[in-house]
C-alpha cells in the first residue's frame, strides 16, 4: 500500500499512477495522504524500482510512504464502481 502526498492536482497524479501496470487500485483520500494505491510487485527490488524510479519521478509527487502487508485478515469485495 502506498500513501502519497502531492503538491499539485491529486486527480491528475492519480490518473497517471493508475496507468502503471503494477497498480491494482487508486483512491483519492482525505487525511494525511492525498492518494492511496495498492501495488503488486514481484519482490523488494521491483517495489524499489516502482517507487523510486517511477512514482517519485512523477511531477507533483511530494512523498510516498510504503506499507507492506504482513498479514491479510479479511478482504471482501461486493460493490461495483458504476
What are these regions (language model features)?
Residues 1-82:
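A compositional/biophysical signature of low hydrophobicity enriched in polar/charged and small residues
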Amino acid at each position: 500500500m502506498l500513501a502519497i502526498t502531492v503538491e499539485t492536482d491529486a486527480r491528475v497524479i492519480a490518473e497517471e499512477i493508475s496507468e502503471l501496470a503494477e497498480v491494482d487500485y487508486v483512491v483519492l483520500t482525505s487525511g494525511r495522504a492525498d492518494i492511496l494505491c495498492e501495488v503488486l510487485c514481484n519482490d523488494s527490488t521491483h517495489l524499489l524500482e516502482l517507487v523510486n524510479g517511477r512514482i517519485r519521478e512523477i511531477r507533483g509527487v511530494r512523498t510516498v510512504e510504503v506499507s507492506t502487508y504482513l498479514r491479510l485478515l479479511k478482504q471482501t469485495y461486493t460493490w461495483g464502481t458504476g
